[in-house]
Amino acid sequence: MLILSFLCPAFLNAQIVTDERMFSFEEPQLPACITGVQSQLGISGAHYKDGKHSLEWTFEPNGKLELRKDLKFEKKDPTGKDLYLSAFIVWIYNEQPQDAAIEFEFLKDGRKCASFPFGINFKGWRAAWVCYERDMQGTPEEGMNELRIVAPNAKGRLFIDHLITATKVDARQQTADLQVPFVNAGTTNHWLVLYKHSLLKPDIELTPVSDRQRQEMKLLEKRFRDMIYTKGKVTEKEAETIRKKYDLYQITYKDGQVSGVPIFMVRASEAYERMIPDWDKDMLTKMGIEMRAYFDLMKRIAVAYNNSEAGSPVREEMKRKFLAMYDHITDQGVAYGSCWGNIHHYGYSVRGLYPAYFLMKDVLREEGKLLEAERTLRWYAITNEVYPKPEGNGIDMDSFNTQTTGRIASILMMEDTPEKLQYLKSFSRWIDYGCRPAPGLAGSFKVDGGAFHHRNNYPAYAVGGLDGATNMIYLFSRTSLAVSELAHRTVKDVLLAMRFYCNKLNFPLSMSGRHPDGQGKLVPMHYAMMAIAGTPDGKGDFDKEMASAYLRLVSSDSSSAEQAPEYMPKVSNAQERKIAKRLVENGFRAESDPQGNLSLGYGCVSVQRRENWSAVARGHSRYLWAAEHYLGHNLYGRYLAHGSLQILTAPPGQTVTPATSGWQQEGFDWNRIPGVTSIHLPLDLLKANVLNVDTFSGMEEMLYSDEAFAGGLSQGKMNGNFGMKLHEHDKYNGTHRARKSYHFIDGMIVCLGSDIENTNTDYPTETTIFQLAVTDKAAHDYWKNNAGEGKVWMDHLGTGYYVPVPARFEKNFPQYSRMQDTGKETKGDWVSLIIDHGKAPKAGSYEYAILPGTDRKTMTAFAKKPAYSVLQQDRNAHILESPSDRITSYVLFETPQSLLPGGLLQRTDTSCLVMVRKESADKVLLTVAQPDLALYRGPSDEAFDKDGKRMERSIYSRPWIDNESGEIPVTVTLKGRWKVAETPFCKVVSEDKKQTVLRFLCKDGASYEVELEK
């Protein structure tokens, strides 16, 4: 049974959960099953972690506390389907640290089966989550019926609370610390290695601090302070809000001991996942006892203290409140050496901790608590991880997001010592290597501008990571600790790419990860920080490109912080305005909307931009997943990267958003993501069946294709193409296949499909040309009269469609759907244009062209004389030419077995993407790309079940994920003799009057181009 607690003082000390396995000691009498040997036992209100009481155990040397009852230990699932393990969970309070340990022993009928030691050299609360079968000595047995706690060879007193004899928990997350350093010893998860990394030693020598270095330390401290704090005033309203929030925690002192409402990290609730019905992972947050709000209040108090007048009553009040909260949270176990049993993803919970302590550095010094506070910050920021020289480029995006601020705060908290200098040198080196292009699917930044998390390009995580990266690049800029030019330029390129694929600020739907809600955006402040960090080579005080990009982006960022998703960094509008003013005063002006073409090999993404519109294609492959689904996140977005093409647009002069582009969540048919060729399923069948498939992953679904060919080519950064072999995973409709291509030529996008097939006889297969929300009167009036016939269609947003194949128009007023996160029913008015391939199609195909930002007259003329002609459209290749643009675009799915149509390009020796542009009678621009990232070669690394079906496996289990992209030679044969300036990636194999043979060395899914001259 769960006893819920609500956000009011009367309930904040209620016992969290009652269960026969849980001991919280809230009854006045000792439980009958608990006895002691050479011990005094009692119920105490002096210290408590759950409810208002704990068990007080005063022991003589080698005394024992015994609990006799069925411990409810369960063995791990022998079938391997359930990966959870039985864990013992306990909180211990110690008033007097002892360099000793107590021993927990688990017995069956008096015979010891398993045990573990717990160090007691601490003051305050500490926790242990210890898995019986993995972490303990001995062999646990079902039916164990006694817990014995054995004291060390010394007197002492401990308080015990929130003891759970056994409960099944996710076995990945238990955390070692100073008390239980042996727990989960094999983990390399970066959230869980606090203890291991606390032992790391520096490889940079200690040196005296020079005068210049001392000045730089002051500069760093000032820059950091300005970054996290903007001077303001403390209003009476703000002071009153702080008082009310502070009073909720009921912090009091008695006999020199602090007490108050128990505080937990959000993940502590995972102890109850298998104990209570309707378990809610966020229950502790809802109960008001989670530490994120606590640290946010500490930061708020620190800001109020800094904003108030010296010697004023409110300043003294804020100081008292801050110190009381500091004492209480330290007592609660937020201290050096403590990991609360389960600490995964704690970065978000302690985000406010670091700036709060840093802003009160002087107060903590005055109170003699600075050293303790420093150590606390260094422990949770895992600052010692920066000591060894990085072995390779890149770090996890979460480290940038949640650890950079903590690490630099923990270092800048220190006095100006040689140790501080050593930390600063180590830290700047760590940031430098972290910002460099990472190999394979490793985090965080890619050579092409991709920003990686969860082994894919993931803007929603990148905005948090870029917050850390850009802040640190600025912090160290123009000092002896500045990052390298490569690191600086890599992050700059990531931001330039992001402002290209976002329009104006919003992520494309297909690039929204598990948040396809239209709310994710880039953060203009990142561009501001890079603008004032100067040029990558360190020569310029400002970066012109970043300044111009920032001034364009910030002008339209009128969204309120309240509307922003939780993962978006919080930004001060005052700071935005201040930097914008500074840049304008220095002569910088906003850039125009970016134009051209971008291909992200590490995102399976192609983007074409003209005027204010963008077209974003996304696919997936054997390297890059199609969609990320969690329980309660992205339930229906299976087809997001099945060759989708989203047009983001707005009337001239308006800011482009999902809404101006005809998208909203209400009523959106998740089957009909524009551009996608998919089986149109009932939403119950489309809903992700989220599983925990292996020990490398949690409850999540990220499905892969077994095809390596998926990605784009970009020619001269102005035009391009995109192709993919679509093969759906066997988890759902594994017989579904298609060959899809997009050809981006100036303001025209030609969309081709062939070889569409599956054996699903229950539901039709469709290619969606558009699906648009109809949200206002003008749009309703527009569609009343229909907006197309035959081959020509115009939507109400100014986009034209040329469709030379039979298509079906649907007007669904209303159309019913479901929310991506809750599954709750929604409705809206929508129009769709689709190509129906029928049920279980064989050799299906389609052809259409899109012209955004056009008019009916132009479209009518286009239909009479299309600006392109298709030369080949089959399983082997999609090839077209645009005579007016003098471009021929090749998507070669298979190695050509005969001469290719189109003139210049005769053969290639492998599948690839090619674009040829005739620049003059004697000059040609040739671009070649191999979309296969080649992280491994040969057949796809699938595992098959007994029926020969591809099994679902997590990306994290694959051994090749951190491999460098391999080089793939692509040999092209051109008609006639051509002169080529050789490059490291392009060599002439042979040439004569009849033909010229070139060999390109392709990697990273990148585009390589050369100029050919007669």
UniProtKB/Swiss-Prot annotation:
Transmembrane segments: none annotated. Residues 1-14 form the signal peptide. The keyword Calcium applies. It is found in: Periplasm. GO terms for cellular component: extracellular region; periplasmic space. The record marks R514 as: Transition state stabilizer. The record marks H344 as: Important for catalytic activity against dermatan sulfate substrate. Its EC number is 4.2.2.21. Its main location: periplasm. One of its GO terms (molecular function) is metal ion binding. It catalyses: Exolytic removal of Delta(4)-unsaturated disaccharide residues from the non-reducing ends of both polymeric chondroitin/dermatan sulfates and their oligosaccharide fragments. It comes from the Bacteria. The active site is at H345, H454, Y461. GO terms for biological process: carbohydrate metabolic process; chondroitin sulfate proteoglycan catabolic process. SUPFAM superfamilies: Chondroitin AC/alginate lyase, Galactose mutarotase-like, Galactose-binding domain-like, Hyaluronate lyase-like, C-terminal domain. Pfam families: Lyase_8, Lyase_catalyt, Lyase_N. Keywords: Calcium, Carbohydrate metabolism, Lyase, Metal-binding, Periplasm, Signal. Monomer. Broad-specificity glycosaminoglycan lyase, which acts in an exolytic fashion degrading chondroitin sulfates and dermatan sulfate to yield only disaccharide products. Has a preference for chondroitin 4-sulfate over chondroitin 6-sulfate. Has extremely low activity against hyaluronic acid. Is not active against acharan sulfate, heparin or heparan sulfate. Belongs to the polysaccharide lyase 8 family. This is Chondroitin sulfate ABC exolyase. It comes from Bacteroides thetaiotaomicron (strain ATCC 29148 / DSM 2079 / JCM 5827 / CCUG 10774 / NCTC 10582 / VPI-5482 / E50). The lineage of its organism: Bacteria, Pseudomonadati, Bacteroidota, Bacteroidia, Bacteroidales. The gene is chonabc.
